[in-house]
Design a protein with these regions (language model features):
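Hydrophobic mid-bilayer segments of alpha-helices in multi-pass membrane transport proteins
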Residues: 2-25, 36-49, 207-217, 226-244, ...
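Interfacial loop-to-helix junctions that mark the boundaries of transmembrane helices
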Residues: 2-8, 29-40, 152-164, 202-204, ...
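Membrane-embedded alpha-helical segments and adjacent helix-loop junctions characteristic
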Residues: 27, 31-117, 258-260, 264-326
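Alpha-helical transmembrane segments
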Residues: 36-48, 156-174, 329-344
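Juxtamembrane and boundary regions of transmembrane helices in multi-pass small-molecule transporters
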Residues: 45, 155-202, 349-397
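Membrane-interface alpha-helices at helix entry/exit sites of multi-pass transporters
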Residues: 73-81, 112-124, 151-162, 327-338, ...
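Alpha-helical transmembrane segments and, especially, the helix-loop junctions at the ends
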Residues: 90-100, 117-151, 173, 308-318, ...
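Long, contiguous bundles of hydrophobic transmembrane helices that form the permeation core
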Residues: 169-247
Length: 397
């Protein structure tokens, strides 16, 4: 099946599904679903355009080259560089961007330094998942949660998410360091089997500096109360206009992740249908029987983590969302559905994208390591983060 057909087929099925849903659902419910998904899909499309055009301009390769210089080019210094790249990318550009963008950069940096790339690659995918709570834009589930109306703006969301997000990152970094510290020294033989797909010395793209300025302005805007899709749309318009004037050949529909967007919309609508058939009431009733607020937080997080590893974190979050009747409870569910899916390969789209990048680089995916190390890490990050959430001061419970 060719690339265009792979895009057309899921969207054709989705459009038919949406038409059927609109015909057989109450009008208010359909309008509400469109109002919820519209800004999210626009954000996904525009942030993808910004990222992909910045990649064409060579921005992220230059950042990686600059970061991995001197003592930071190998040993523990390279681990720190990888952590910073993955954490910043996940926070501002989403976990999926980290999987697709940072993974090949890290593999190339590891090859250049003569490192075993697997410890660094595993650290990247862990941070992509366990570092994806701090901002609404860090994860698609966060965006869906913000659109429920339970959060009073971006500032309220960040105040709730900051402490558990920090706890998760601390646990992840500590775990990575303890497990891999002896494997972070470069090998004299290097990694000759790894294809060099990362940073290379080359002439600067004419739009490199403009891309850097656009991204530098965009990132802090994503932390403000300005609607996230306004900021990314403006950034996308600027870069598309600039490339249209200098290099139109890179402006094509593949800049937008159509298939991923179709899957996200389809899963959302499918879960909405399942809820309308009676599951929503069962979910609410089941969790309402918990006697304490703290018990509800831990139950939602645990259920989100387990269900994410059984199916996938997006439908897991959507299935359990009705049980979260406050911003605090919804944050607990996000902790489980964001940090928990690091055990099974299919639990997170970011993990699948990460594995694809490893295969493209000629590496086998270490699924056994991923699963065995993911179990204690998932338990640790989810447990510590929910504990931290329970101590967030001055917020509704």
């Amino acid at each position: 099946m060719g690339a265009p057909l792979r895009t057309v087929v899921p969207w054709t099925i989705l459009v038919g599904f949406l038409i059927a849903y609109a015909l057989f659902s109450p009008r208010a419910q359909t309008i509400g679903l469109i109002g919820r998904l519209g800004p999210i899909m626009l954000f996904l499309a525009t942030i993808s355009i910004v990222i992909n055009l910045a990649v064409v301009a060579g921005l992220f390769h230059r950042v990686a080259e600059f970061a991995a210089t001197g003592r930071a080019a190998s040993g523990p210094g390279l681990w720190v560089v990888v952590v910073l790249l993955a954490a910043v990318s996940t926070t501002f550009l989403s976990l999926d961007t980290t999987a697709v963008l940072v993974t090949p950069l890290v593999l190339a940096l590891a090859r250049r330094a003569g490192h075993d790339p697997i410890p660094l690659a595993l650290t990247v995918v862990w941070i992509a998942n366990t570092g994806s709570l701090i901002l609404p834009v860090s994860n698609l589930t966060n965006l869906m949660a913000v659109e429920t109306g339970l959060f009073d703006g971006t500032g309220h969301y960040i105040r709730l998410a900051a402490l558990p997000a920090t706890a998760s990152l601390v646990v992840t970094l500590g775990f990575s360091w303890v497990v891999f510290r002896r494997r972070l020294q470069p090998s004299p033989q290097g990694q000759p089997g790894l294809r060099n797909t990362g940073p290379q010395k080359s002439a600067a793209h004419p739009l490199l500096h403009l891309s850097g300025c656009v991204v530098a302005v965009l990132l802090p805007l994503l932390t403000t109360s300005i609607p996230f899709w306004w900021s990314t749309s403006a950034a996308a318009i600027i870069l598309v206009t600039a490339f249209a004037l200098t290099d139109r050949s890179v402006l094509h529909p593949k800049l937008v992740p159509w298939t991923a967007m179709a899957v996200a919309v389809g899963l959302t609508v499918a879960v909405q249908v399942v809820h309308s058939l009676g599951l929503e009431g069962l979910v609410r009733t089941g969790f309402a029987q918990l006697e304490t607020a703290e018990g509800l937080l831990f139950a939602l997080a645990a259920a989100g983590a387990v269900l994410s590893n059984l199916i996938n974190n997006i439908p897991a979050y959507l299935l359990l969302e009705p049980a979260a009747d406050s911003s605090l409870a919804l944050t607990a569910l996000l902790i489980g559905s964001n940090f928990g899916p690091i055990v099974t390969p299919w639990a997170s789209l970011a993990t699948l994208l990460w594995a694809d990048q490893l295969r493209r680089a000629g590496l086998g995916v270490p699924w056994r390591q991923f699963i065995l190390l993911g179990i204690p890490l998932a338990v640790g990050t989810v447990g510590m983060s929910v504990t931290a959430l329970a101590f967030v001061p001055g917020l509704d419970r």
